[in-house]
A protein has these predicted regions:
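Short beta-strand/turn micro-motifs composed of small residues
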Residues: 19, 43, 108
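SF2 helicase catalytic motif II
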Residues: 59-61, 68-113
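Conserved interdomain linker/interface between the two RecA-like ATPase lobes of SF2 helicase motors
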Residues: 135-180
Length: 180
């Protein structure tokens, strides 16, 4: 949310913050509300407004208006960027057709996908990521390590070893269609 505010302040233009779910739209909008800046929400289950310079939206709802309204935005921030979908790619394509200078910022805690590798081509040191298979993002701009987050209280320190539990009751667990 603070990144959205910073980008809006720097550009003076509209920022679209795309989330994969209404719950994440609400969560990010609530954090942004703490800045005191106005914002809009564009999500079928929450409300639909494009009025303010920062818009929090779900991809499924925003895709219906991306062609007509996408040109208004200078930047798209993708929450959970490791889950980039064909819908998101279409939204960005529609927006870039009318605004070739559109910037896309992806945010994720998990930049590596099993089977696909990294979601970016080049790391912060300028090294090409050989494990990246058709990454959507060109470059990783900033990374925060787990130790940094633990030291500042954002994450709890992991506990390794015995949990004090002799075992778990898995009698009521059901296998899915893949038997997992």
């Amino acid at each position: 949310a603070n990144i959205a505010r910073l980008l809006k302040d720097l550009s003076g233009k509209k920022i679209l913050y795309l989330c994969p779910s209404a719950g994440l739209v609400e969560q990010n909008a609530e954090k942004f509300a703490l800045t005191g800046e106005p914002y809009s929400v564009y999500s079928a289950s929450i409300g639909k407004s494009l009025r303010h310079d920062v818009v929090f939206a779900t991809e499924g709802t925003f895709k219906k208006v991306s062609e007509e309204n996408g040109y208004r935005f200078s930047c798209v921030i993708l929450d959970e960027a490791h889950r980039i979908t064909p819908t998101i790619k279409k939204i960005i394509s529609d927006m870039r057709a009318k605004n070739p200078n559109l910037r896309v910022v992806g945010m994720t805690a998990t930049p590596y996908r099993l089977g696909d590798g990294y979601i970016y081509e080049i790391d912060t040191q300028g090294r090409k990521m050989e494990e990246a298979k058709s990454p959507y993002f060109k470059k990783l701009v900033y990374a925060v390590g787990g130790r940094y987050l633990v030291e500042r209280g954002y994450l709890t320190r992991p506990v390794i070893g015995r949990t004090g539990v002799a075992g778990y009751n898995t009698d009521k667990l059901k296998l899915n269609s893949n038997n997992s």
